[in-house]
UniProtKB/Swiss-Prot annotation:
GO terms for cellular component: membrane. NCBIfam families: export_SdpA. The gene is yitP. It holds the Pfam family SdpA. Its main location: membrane. This is Uncharacterized protein YitP. It is found in: Membrane.
Length: 178
């Protein structure tokens, strides 16, 4: 019993120290300075650091809406019940396919939208014909692809949606299912 408690304490101290030094090593100037050698050692042990957690929350989001109605076509987030809480890959596949379609739309094809209503933006959108390169396409037909700004949480009670459409394009996606 004493042996397992000692092992647990030593193991906890080692992992806790590694975690603490990885955080301190990724910070700038701190009250607990590390030498250059210590920072180099930490970056060689944990090379990726903590940067993968730092996505800008104000980045532009991409939206995809059916041409016939205002509902979002894609089945996100992935952890919803109709995606079997992440087990069903349909939503993830749509995201990849939508990214490929988004990359095919040129900058000059987007129409700026200052209206708050998605319907008003739809009436101004340019139409673009695209062909999906996906071997088993999920997105075929007419959709509206949007660039949207996320409304900050502090303003969310003043807007009907958590996103504000900044630009829009109508894409007609032709598919050759094999």
């Amino acid at each position: 019993m004493q042996k397992s408690i000692s092992f647990f304490v030593i193991f906890s101290i080692l992992w806790g120290s590694l975690f603490l030094f990885s955080i301190i090593g990724s910070l700038g100037t701190t009250p607990i300075p590390l030498t250059k050698d210590s920072k180099f050692l930490m970056s060689s042990i944990l090379p990726q650091g903590w940067g993968f957690f730092s996505k800008n929350p104000r980045d532009t989001a991409i939206g995809l809406y059916e041409a016939e109605n205002a509902s979002a076509k894609v089945r996100w987030p992935n952890m919803r019940a109709d995606n079997l809480f992440g087990l069903y890959r349909y939503g993830r596949s749509q995201g990849v396919e939508m990214g490929v379609i988004y990359s095919q739309v040129g900058k000059e094809q987007w129409t700026a939208c200052k209206e708050k209503d998605l319907g008003a933006c739809k009436s101004k959108a340019k139409t673009v014909q695209l062909k999906t390169p996906a071997p088993r396409p999920l997105l075929c037909g007419s959709y509206y692809l949007t660039k949207e700004d996320i409304v900050p949480w502090s303003y969310s009670k003043y807007t009907p949606s958590s996103y504000q459409v900044k630009s829009i394009v109508k894409v007609v996606i032709s598919c050759s299912k094999t």
